[in-house]
Amino acid sequence: SDVYKRQTLERAIEGLKCETAVHICYGYGIKANTDWKKTLGSEWRQYEEAFPKLQKSSIDIVSLECHNSRVPMDLIELIRGKKVMVGAIDVASNTLETPEEVANTLRKALQFVDADKLYPCTNCGMAPLPRHVARGKLQALSAGAEIVRRELSNPY
């Protein structure tokens, strides 16, 4: 039940004195996951149900897959006020994002997340990726985040 899920999440962080985070994952780019994702339709609206519950939880940070995800970005509005790790790097592909692609993902998220609560990150872990690909993706993440930081600090 939904009450049980929230109680389980609260119990997991009980007594912790640090910031807490939950990562909502659609899985790595392995064949079983990519096949499953194809069955989910053109929009993944499951967050519509989960986000209001997360909004009421004691969790401080919500980590989301945003780049190349089919989750509508506007659903992030349902967790406004939480810190949000915005996944701007697709870990299910060896294709390197450009800094501008990263910046575009972050700009979209900024419509629903206050700038001081947005944490640019990857969609998930990069363990399955070749090291040179992971390094290139992290460089794009850093450069894309820097583009947006400059825009926010100098809006003219």
Give the residues covered by each predicted segment.
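A contiguous, surface-oriented mixed alpha/beta subdomain in the mid-to-C-terminal portion of proteins
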Residues: 11, 15-21, 41, 60, ...
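Structured aminoacyl-transfer and RNA-binding surfaces used for tRNA recognition/handling
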Residues: 6-9, 36, 40-43, 51, ...
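Catalytic-face loop-and-helix region of soluble metabolic enzyme cores
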Residues: 47-155
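Short, solvent-exposed polar/charged micro-motifs at secondary-structure junctions
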Residues: 31-34, 129
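Intrinsically disordered, low-complexity boundary segments flanking structured domains
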Residues: 9-12, 75
